[in-house]
Amino acid sequence: MSPERERFLAITAESLYLANLLLAPGLGFLGLLWLWRRPDVPALPLARQHLRQTLVASLWAGVLLVGLSATILLIGGFESMWSWLAVILYFTFFHSTLVLCGMVGLSRAMAGQPFRFPLIGPRDRE
């Protein structure tokens, strides 16, 4: 398989990650799962690495954004303005950070280089 095809799949994985965060939550993740099921991806190390990173980062993003925001609201109460302030600040900070990491991952995929998400990205087994 050509390096261009491998780079294209890596770029697609990073683009779907960003689409999951910015444009179509859920649909982008389904696209990542569909891409993971493709038979040609395991043979392509760069595409496999980017796809694995984006899948794990998407799962962490769901836990960090939805799970912890809901926990803050449940603990603080839905009527408390301080709970909403905390949720808005928390969500804005983490969402921006995840998008920024996705942009760096996309630029690395476009350059044909590997990328690991800081803190939440899995380490390569190879």
Task: Give the role of each language-model region.
Residues L9-F29, V56-G102:
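Hydrophobic alpha-helical transmembrane segments in multi-pass membrane proteins
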Residues M1-L23, L27-A57, M103-E126:
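Membrane-interface extramembranous regions at the lipid-water interface
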